[in-house]
Amino acid sequence: MPLDLTTPKPLLSAEREAMRLGAGAPDSYAGAFEAVYAAAWLPVFRLALAWTNDWSAAEDLAQEAFLRLWDRRAEVDWSLPVLPWLLVTTRRTATDRFRRLRRALAVRGPIEVVPGSDARIEWLDLRASFRALSALERSALVLTALEDLDAAQAGEILGIAANAVRSAASRGRRKLKEQR
C-alpha cells in the first residue's frame, strides 16, 4: 500500500493519548512513544524528504530523530507537544549530514550530471536554486509551504520570531522566482 504523504495524522489526539497513558511513569514510556510516533512520523518524514529529496535518506533522518527522542525519553515532558522538538532535531541532523557531504564533495570534486529528460533537468535546476537559498530561507519555506505551519509555529521550531520567518520565506520565494 503506498504511503499517503498528503494526510497528516492528528497530532493532538495522539499527544493526549500519550498523556492519558501516564507518560511520566517509566513503564509507560513505550506507550507514550508509540502514540507520538504514530502521530508525528509523517510530518517528520515529510520534512526530512523535503531536505534530502531521497526517500531512503529521509527515512534514516526521521528514524534518527525518533531514536534521539527515545534516548531522551526520561528527560521529555510528555505533557508538552513533542513535534516541534522532533522537527528541530530532524533539521539539525539534516544540516549536519549536508555539511559532511559538502566537505566530502569538496575533497572529491564536482559530480558530473548526465543530461536526461527536460523534467529531470528542471528538477535539478530547482534543487540547485533551493540549495542556493540560505539555511534559514530553506527552513522557513519547508516549514511554512510544505508542512503548512504558520509563522509562529515555524518560528518556535527555528528559534526566531514569526516576523523573521515570514521575511525569510518571502525572500526565499522571491529568489526562487528570480532564478526561474
Model-predicted regions and their roles:
Residues M19-A25, A35, D125-L133:
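Short amphipathic alpha-helical boundary/capping segments
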